[in-house]
Structure formats: C-alpha cells, structure tokens
Amino acid sequence: MTTTLGMKKSWELHGQALQVIPMATQTHSKAPREALRGIEPCFLVRGKGCRVWDLDGNEYIDFRNGLGPITLGYFYPTVDDAIRQQMEDGIIFSYPHPLEVEVAERLVRVIPCAERVR
C-alpha cells in the first residue's frame, strides 16, 4: 500500500521553479521525479541527523543523502559551530584559505592511496 503525503506547497513551488529553473533545480540529481509525486519531496527546508523535513512539514529519513550530509548527517553541532565561527571572517574567498592546506594534509595522511586531494 502506498500512502500519498500532503505536498501541496512543495508541488506549487515546484511549478513556480520550473518557470525559471530547468528541471526546477540547479543539479540533475536533485530533480524530483514525476513518477514519485506524492511520495518523494520536491524541496527540503530542514535537516537533523539522518532526518529531513519538506516544505509541507513531512518528515523523512534521507536515503538520498547529499555530498555533505552523507558522512555526518545534517545539523552536526561540531561542524555547524566551526562554520558559524568562520562566517565572522567571511567565506567563499576568491583565493584559497589556509585551512584548505591543513585539511588536504590530513586527508593525505589518513587515505593510504592519496598522494594529493582536491
């Protein structure tokens, strides 16, 4: 048995997004599939641990994951605190930040086959 969730707000925004964004998203992998209408969310507005919530307030376990949350989940306090701290100095600079070198060195140390990382 399939239960259809209430997704009125989500699909209304999806229609709006299609007018200005091809496939209603910036990345193909995030595009909602029409075949899963009423089952799969179109937009997520919140996440914590492995759970996410859509625009209509429906809660899901995120089996799709994203590039960031696949390792630690969403709203990981240690990471979020570090981000907030860095935001005071600015983010997304036009040149590399020293932290990039520190992180790359750590990754090369712990990944036996990695000589360099990006």
Give, region by region, the residue ranges found by the protein language model.
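N-terminal alpha-helical segment of soluble enzymes
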Residues: 1-3, 86
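Active-site-adjacent loop/helix segments that line or gate small-molecule/cofactor pockets in enzymes
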Residues: 3-46
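Short, hydrophobic/aliphatic alpha-helical segments
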Residues: 8-18, 51-58, 108-109
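Short capping/connector residues at structural and topological boundaries
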Residues: 26, 48-49, 72-77
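Short active-site-proximal "capping" loops at secondary-structure junctions
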Residues: 35, 49, 68-69
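Active-site and channel-lining beta-strand-loop segments
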Residues: 41-64
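Glycine-rich loop-to-alpha-helix module at the N-terminal edge of alpha/beta enzyme cores
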Residues: 59-118
